[in-house]
Amino acid sequence: MSKIAKTAIISPKAEIGKGVEIGEFCVIGDGVKLDEGVKLHNNVTLQGHTFIGKNTEIFPFAVLGTQPQDLKYKGEYSELMVGEDNLIREFCMINPGTEGGIKKTLIGDKNLLMAYVHVAHDCVIGSHCILANGVTLAGHIEIGDYVNIGGLTAIHQFVRIAKGCMIAGKSALGKDVPPYCTVEGNRAFIRGLNRHRMRQLLESKDIDFIHALYKRLFRPIPSLRESAKLELEEHANNPFVKEICSFILESSRGVAYKSSEYSSEEKQEE
């Protein structure tokens, strides 16, 4: 049975699932759909064509689904899709997509978005990610699974962050980050590998292989792109080579790599 506060303002066109809790002074618009077990604390605003998945919990003063902050937006149909078991903390803002992107913003399952996180239009966030307080994502950003982003970090539009990466706090990131890397700084560059996450997700032999692969890729000569092409030719059937090298070759913004900033020393990768 759903539990809905008397002061909540809910459109009759909204769809409310079983066991949903809606706190005091929440505002729920026409196109909103709440799956079963969703919990909204007080003063949450949900607008637009917004879907919230099972057991997601949204805290006070979060605003989801209002018009994208994009001057090109002209009122076209767009969506915000949030998966299951997410925690969205106070004052988060998440905008739907636009005609200039994929027409939707997508958030996977089991993510934690801490207070004051901003997710702009057409972003895609995977599952099991943590975005710490004050993280700001511009439009069209893609974030893979198991990514951690430190507080007060800003990320440029169209940047891609692959699976298992760690972005240090107070960073300004303007280029793509391939799988399992750590980046830090303003501007942020790759500093090493995220071995903590790798140990959680991979076997030891695979970690060693990826470490050796990055050492070869990040040699001064040949270029990073040429090295990626060579690795794909030599190890075409290896899934890690495919994942990492294809990501590098598909990058339109370039990779956040500078030889003077990267260290392969074990002590800097922990």
Curated annotation (Swiss-Prot):
The principal location of this protein is cytoplasm
Q: Which InterPro entries match?
A: Acetyltransf_C (IPR029098), Acetyltransf_C_sf (IPR037157), Hexapep (IPR001451), Hexapep_transf_CS (IPR018357), Lipid_A_LpxA (IPR010137), Trimer_LpxA-like_sf (IPR011004)
Q: What is its EC number?
A: 2.3.1.129
Which SUPFAM superfamilies does this chain map to? Trimeric LpxA-like enzymes (SSF51161)
Cellular component annotations (GO), alphabetically ordered? cytoplasm; membrane
Per UniProt, the keywords (alphabetical) are: Acyltransferase, Cytoplasm, Lipid A biosynthesis, Lipid biosynthesis, Lipid metabolism, Repeat, Transferase
Record-level GO BP terms: lipid A biosynthetic process
Localization annotation: Cytoplasm
Question: Which PROSITE patterns does the record match to this protein?
Answer: HEXAPEP_TRANSFERASES
Q: Which reaction does it catalyse?
A: a (3R)-hydroxyacyl-[ACP] + UDP-N-acetyl-alpha-D-glucosamine = a UDP-3-O-[(3R)-3-hydroxyacyl]-N-acetyl-alpha-D-glucosamine + holo-[ACP]
Q: In which pathway does it act?
A: Glycolipid biosynthesis; lipid IV(A) biosynthesis; lipid IV(A) from (3R)-3-hydroxytetradecanoyl-[acyl-carrier-protein] and UDP-N-acetyl-alpha-D-glucosamine: step 1/6
Any Pfam family? Acetyltransf_11
Any one GO MF annotation of this record: acyl-[acyl-carrier-protein]-UDP-N-acetylglucosamine O-acyltransferase activity
Repeat among keywords: yes
Family to which the UniProt record says this protein belongs: Belongs to the transferase hexapeptide repeat family. LpxA subfamily.
Q: How does it assemble?
A: Homotrimer.
Q: What HAMAP family does this protein's entry cite?
A: LpxA
Q: Which NCBIfam families match?
A: lipid_A_lpxA (TIGR01852), PRK05289.1 (NF003657)
Q: What does this protein do?
A: Involved in the biosynthesis of lipid A, a phosphorylated glycolipid that anchors the lipopolysaccharide to the outer membrane of the cell.
**Name of this protein:** Acyl-[acyl-carrier-protein]--UDP-N-acetylglucosamine O-acyltransferase
